[in-house]
C-alpha cells in the first residue's frame, strides 16, 4: 500500500486525512500542492480514478476566480490552468496506486486498509 496525500498546508480536511492514517499507523506521503504541484502522470491517474476534471477543481478558490477558469469552454485549457495553479485542486486528494479520492472520505479509505 502506497498512500499519497496531495493537499494544502492550511486545509483542515487535509489535516484530518493525515490524522486518519496516522491513527491507524499507515505510512503515507504528504505532497503540498502549493509547493510542489502534481505531475502530469499523477494528474492523469487521479483524473481517471475520480471520473473527471470537474470533481478535481475547487470552484470556490481564489485562484479559480482570478484565472477566469469558469469562462474557459475547452477542458484542455482548464487542465492547463489547473496544473499551472495547483491551489485550484479540491483537497485532499488521497491516492493509493490506481485508486483515488477527493475530499475527506474515510468510508472509502477503510476498504483500502
Model feature map: region roles:
Residues 1-20, 28-33:
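Local sequence-structure signature of Cys/Sec-based thiol-disulfide redox active-site neighborhoods
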Residues 20-27, 42, 48:
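N-terminal non-globular leader segments, chiefly Sec-dependent signal peptides
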Residues 26-29, 62:
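Short, solvent-exposed secondary-structure junction/capping segments
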Residues 33-113:
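Thiol/selenol-based redox catalytic cores and closely related redox-interacting motifs
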Amino acid at each position: 500500500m502506497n498512500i499519497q496525500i496531495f493537499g494544502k498546508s492550511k486545509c483542515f480536511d487535509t489535516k484530518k486525512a493525515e490524522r486518519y492514517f496516522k491513527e491507524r499507523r499507515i505510512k503515507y506521503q504528504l505532497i503540498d500542492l502549493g509547493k510542489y504541484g502534481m505531475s502530469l502522470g499523477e494528474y492523469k491517474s487521479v483524473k481517471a480514478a475520480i471520473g473527471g476534471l470537474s470533481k478535481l477543481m475547487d470552484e470556490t478558490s481564489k485562484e479559480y476566480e482570478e484565472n477566469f477558469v469558469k469562462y474557459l469552454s475547452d477542458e484542455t485549457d482548464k487542465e492547463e490552468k489547473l496544473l499551472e495553479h495547483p491551489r485550484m485542486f479540491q483537497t485532499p486528494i488521497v491516492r493509493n496506486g490506481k485508486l483515488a479520492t477527493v475530499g475527506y472520505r474515510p468510508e472509502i479509505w477503510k476498504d483500502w486498509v
